[in-house]
Amino acid sequence: MKMQIQGETLQISEFAELGAANSNDFRDKARAALTAAQKNIEIDLSQTMFMDSCGLGTLISLHKTTCSRNGAVKLVNPTPNVRQVLDLTRMHRLFEIVNR
């Protein structure tokens, strides 16, 4: 998993799955990387082939964290499998999902 800071945004990329095996670690690392200056998180899902309910829970947890800072979580380039999970669970109503 790669993280970098761009202005008010923490950008996260390069991870193959977000599920029960790694979701707590993912959430903890993302929260630890946020400083007082970052209020947004942008998650690049272009290499993520698998996401389960634990992964969705992690995204919702990060959403709550950013909302408390008046920010948001943006999901970028989800793979077809991940996009299907997001659509079936109606997460597109909660998150901005962008294809670049």
Regions from the PLM with identified roles:
Residues 1-2, 100:
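Absolute protein N-terminus
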Residues 29, 59-62:
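Aromatic/hydrophobic pocket-lining residues that form π-stacking "cages" and hydrophobic walls in ligand
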Residues 10, 41, 71-73:
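Conserved beta-strand core positions
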Residues 65-99:
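C-terminal structural segments of small proteins and small subunits
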Residues 2-28:
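STAS-typified acidic loop motif
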Residues 31-52, 76:
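Short, glycine-/small-residue-enriched flexible loop/hinge segments at domain edges that mediate gating
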